Amino acid sequence: MGQKTNPIGNRLGIIRGWDSNWYGGNDYGDKIAEDYKIRKYIHARLSKASVSKVIIERTLKLVTVTITTARPGIIIGKGGQEVDKLKEELKKVTDKEVQINIFEIKRPELDAFLVATSICRQIESRISYRRAIKMAIAASMRMNAEGIKVLISGRLNGAEMARSEGFKEGRVPLSTFRADIDYALAEAHTTYGRMGIKVWIMKGEVYGKRDLSPLAGMDKKQAGQGGGKGGDSPRGDRKPFNKGGKPDARKRK
């Protein structure tokens, strides 16, 4: 079942926490819809800021929105002007006081959502999907990821029939609950239609008790940009795999 389920939802309450933390009474449905609007608005408004997670916490009169990003300087702006504007805009959505916290992602190469969106942008810029995926895999492995798997589906290279093609390096044990696996899905909009990109990144294994907060281990930042360098790590063999379509050309030789 680990191959079929969402790796994040499958580990909730074990090694992962929830991205929405509040008590819902009779207006539970309204709060769910409001959370969706907040996340959709932030991702659209801050599309150039490399936003990954939007974590929402609620009290009776306050909504706390925590944004994890690789480029906090874009969100904060000069003297905090941009974050103040965002706060006022979110007040109109929630009709409550809004507090915004910003956390920096120091190694965006290990964030599945940022890796998936980066691949999408390159495909939309007409870069070969194989080149974009292999570069993303190499960057993640350089940052000491234990494994990464990427699956792309759609009309690859403009083919008439849609198919799926995958790339894998290292180990990604989806059935091991203690495995810290990040997962994301993103879509690339091309002239041939939409392409779906799924990314799984294995960061390591968790032993013993762990803080289930979604922000466990992250540092709060006021400004600056994400990034950082990591040492080289031993890699497994890269294993391309196909689902449907033509078999791998290397196998026909």
Curated annotation (Swiss-Prot):
Q: Does the keyword RNA-binding apply?
A: yes
Q: Which InterPro entries match?
A: KH_dom (IPR004087), KH_dom-like_a/b (IPR015946), KH_dom_type_2 (IPR004044), KH_sf_prok-type (IPR009019), Ribosomal_S3_C_sf (IPR036419), Ribosomal_uS3_bac-typ (IPR005704), Ribosomal_uS3_C (IPR001351), Ribosomal_uS3_CS (IPR018280)
Task: Show which residues constitute the signal peptide.
Answer: none
What biological-process GO terms show up in the record? translation
Instruction: Kindly indicate whether the keyword rRNA-binding belongs to this entry.
Output: yes
Which positions fall inside the KH type-2 domain? 38-106
| Keyword list, A-Z | Ribonucleoprotein, Ribosomal protein, RNA-binding, rRNA-binding
Q: Which GO terms describe its cellular component?
A: cytosolic small ribosomal subunit
Residue spans of biased composition, Basic and acidic residues class? 232-253
Which region ranges are annotated with the description Disordered?
Answer: 216-253
Under Pfam families, the record lists: KH_2, Ribosomal_S3_C
Any one GO MF term held by the record is: mRNA binding
Q: Can you tell which superkingdom this protein's organism belongs to?
A: Bacteria
> Which PROSITE patterns does this one have?
KH_TYPE_2, RIBOSOMAL_S3
Q: How does it assemble?
A: Part of the 30S ribosomal subunit. Forms a tight complex with proteins S10 and S14.
Described purpose of this protein according to its UniProt entry: Binds the lower part of the 30S subunit head. Binds mRNA in the 70S ribosome, positioning it for translation.
Family as reported in the entry's similarity comment: Belongs to the universal ribosomal protein uS3 family.
From the Swiss-Prot or TrEMBL record, give the protein name: Small ribosomal subunit protein uS3
Show the taxonomic lineage: Bacteria, Pseudomonadati, Bacteroidota, Flavobacteriia, Flavobacteriales
